[in-house]
Swiss-Prot record:
This is Formimidoylglutamase. SUPFAM superfamilies: Arginase/deacetylase (SSF52768). Its EC number is 3.5.3.8. Catalyzes the conversion of N-formimidoyl-L-glutamate to L-glutamate and formamide.
Amino acid sequence: MLEDYYPSTTSYYHGGIDDDLYTAKWGMVMTFLDLNDSSLTPFEGTHFALIGFKSDKGVYINNGRVGAVESPAAIRTQLAKFPWHLGNQVMVYDVGNIDGPNRSLEQLQNSLSKAIKRMCDFNLKPIVLGGGHETAYGHYLGLRQSLSPSDDLAVINMDAHFDLRPYGQTGPNSGTGFRQMFDDAVADKRLFKYFVLGIQEHNNNLFLFDFVAKSKGIQFLTGQDIYQMGHQKVCRAIDRFLEGQERVYLTIDMDCFSVGAAPGVSAIQSLGVDPNLAVLVLQHIAASGKLVGFDVVEVSPPHDIDNHTANLAATFIFYLVQIMAQHR
């Protein structure tokens, strides 16, 4: 039995019901699935599993604005309203949440990793609704556990921050997940392939830039780079990064976008990547056929305005799943 795991029992769609897939919405079509069901066998074809990570403990430790614990419900509510474009050959299962208010951050990350591993065992592509960006380490661990030690797994992070901070004194938090991945790779004598899109210089200290400069395998584009380059050149940079890689894990921190587009985040951003450009880049990553799982993190509903940020996060999910389904 999975620890800290709670299957979904409540629908987030409250509109009319229509059996016609041409007019259906996500909330009508998504089906509940219990990962602890002993009768489950691997699925055939391309299908997705949506799981919430109800934790912002890492944000609290990192002195950010707490509230991301409420994000999975907020994103589900927005996603449920979107039109269903996936036909009847692709399914998105809502498998519930990882939740444990009295559990440590490390325990919850471990529980998420086991749930991700189980999804992969059932041939379901994971979609994780954070939670703080501590979500990423648990998601990454689960994906790695589903692979053999020699298998590659590149990481693309759309984020204003590197999240490569050392964690010896404070312990893991929302700003250390990719340093933990890096350290794991060093311990296993693997190269950590990591590409950050949307870095803001005023959000990262010189120690982090120095660490990146000295670390083989880590690349980044600033938000200003992306603005000047345009999406086609950004996509070519991603292609070069993914050359020779068979798998990529994608994580989207909603603080990559300006406060005008994403006001409800753990750490607001005055500058930021254009969401329209981001959609084109995300679709390109999905079209590579290498994307094995993705998450959206750091939505903070208590700080949101008219659900703008939750809706944007749901929009990214909509387009990523659509392209992944087409390239199955």
